[in-house]
Amino acid sequence: MLYIIGLGLYDENDISIKGLRAIEDCDEVYAEFYTAMLQGSSLSAIERRIGRSVKVLGRGEIEEERIPIERALELDVALLVAGDPLVATTHTELLIDAHRRGIETRVIHSSSIISAAPGLAGLQAYKFGRIITIPFTSDNYFPTSPYTNIGENLKAGSHSLVLLDIEAHRNRYMTATEGLRYLLKASEKLDDGTISGETLAVVIARAGSEKPLVRADKIATLVEEDFGDPLHCLVVPAGLHFIEADYLVEIAGAPRAVVERMIL
């Protein structure tokens, strides 16, 4: 049996009771933190919470050597992952491989930024369009597709959840400020008027913690601010319902003049 168990958003206390009980039944417990890492926790804290030792696997050990699959041929194995298990394609591929090899599987879900961010931003979840990721750029690599995809969402009247690149193995996490700078640079490069310094955006930091940060304003203001420790993400809203607008003012600190022009 292969269990893929979500650890949730922020720390070791986010794992579900169902997940803890499944771990009790497992012969071996593995984890991967290259797709994401719990920023409010550590391996030792996770081990204390679940009462088991955990072997952390690298990308090659999972995607090439298929260690969880090989071990699950004979044993009950748990693979712990940050967030919700099936958001990452890597974990979906493991389930496909396990099914083809006759291994029984069970997925135990947990909280994810995909569902948490719309709620924290006070925006109606069904109004979100395609999820966007801004990658780390360089002098030789500057894709504009994240920017244009946000534009497509805006044209459709859909909010955009914008995830920011991480390189967990390097302890490198894109900040909201870096993401906003990307949007302004892409806007300057394409010169299409989709996004500007006057565009409303929402910054979310440390979702799942006791005190997550939610801050809304025009990009020109936000890009000058410091949002503290990771993880960060962005939301670029389309047209707003009046309740969404009130939330951004009252909870996220947006100037009313900035959001009122967005009310449908």
UniProtKB/Swiss-Prot annotation:
Catalysed transformations (reactions): 2-[(3S)-amino-3-carboxypropyl]-L-histidyl-[translation elongation factor 2] + 3 S-adenosyl-L-methionine = diphthine-[translation elongation factor 2] + 3 S-adenosyl-L-homocysteine + 3 H(+)
InterPro entries in alphabetical order: 4pyrrol_Mease (IPR000878), 4pyrrol_Methylase_sf (IPR035996), 4pyrrole_Mease_sub1 (IPR014777), 4pyrrole_Mease_sub2 (IPR014776), Dphthn_synthase (IPR004551)
Annotated keywords: Methyltransferase, S-adenosyl-L-methionine, Transferase
A GO biological process held by the record: methylation
Functional description taken from the UniProt entry: S-adenosyl-L-methionine-dependent methyltransferase that catalyzes the trimethylation of the amino group of the modified target histidine residue in translation elongation factor 2 (EF-2), to form an intermediate called diphthine. The three successive methylation reactions represent the second step of diphthamide biosynthesis.
Lineage, highest ranks first: Archaea, Methanobacteriati, Methanobacteriota, Methanomada group, Methanobacteria
Regions annotated as coiled coil: none
Biological source species: Methanothermobacter thermautotrophicus (strain ATCC 29096 / DSM 1053 / JCM 10044 / NBRC 100330 / Delta H) (Methanobacterium thermoautotrophicum)
Any GO MF annotation of the entry: diphthine synthase activity
Quaternary organization: Homodimer.
CDD domains: DHP5_DphB
Name by which UniProt lists this protein: Diphthine synthase
Residues binding S-adenosyl-L-methionine, per UniProt: 9, 84, 87, 112-113, 164, 207, 232
Domain of life of the native organism: Archaea
